[in-house]
Amino acid sequence: APKQGLNPSHPVSRFGAGNLDTLKKPGLLDALKRFYTSEYSANRMALVVLGEEPLDALEQLVRDRFTEIPNRQLPSSATELPLFDTERLPFVVQSRPATEARWLTLLFPVPDTDAFADRDPLRYVGHLLGHESEGSLLAHLKSKGYANGLSAGESLSMTESRSFSISISLTPKGFAHRDEIISEIFRTIRLIETRGIDSWRFDELKMISDANFKFEEESI
């Protein structure tokens, strides 16, 4: 549903999933092959390899498995289209889920933050908004019986376009007080803007990030 609020001309706004009904349409396989031929090329791809083997062995491993990918010398697939059509904002989308669930999601267009990658400002703001300690936004909403959980952070990252989302799992009572919850969200955002950055919170986030990296489970 949030995709309905994006710029309809942007590729990300297109339907990105299928089911037995949509995937049974005739000609789909041929269309997929045409898309592969027109859009997939080695010069558009990047690969990161991590392993304990010597560098020469890793290089040979990659060559053995990926050299058959054709290089069609295609131009960059990046688009300069904005992710959001500002003339359509603010935009409200309501949908009925297939399961018993109540979610309130706020999606904000934000400037590109690549120049600040070493400081990761969106993660810092997401950490503040998503904190679960006493006095936090979630703790306040829980005390009123409005929410079960909250997450915040960067949700879409495209060339020159990004978005930041705040998603709250609502109780039935919270669903009936959506406008009040939205007001509380913006009150918290204004509080962050007014108080600025606390060094101890930045250090807290750094400590959490270091611990997550150190104890991250290996994946295959």
Listing of model-derived features with the role each one plays in the protein:
Residues 1-77, 83-87, 92-121, 127, ...:
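Charge-rich, well-structured scaffold segments of protease-associated domains
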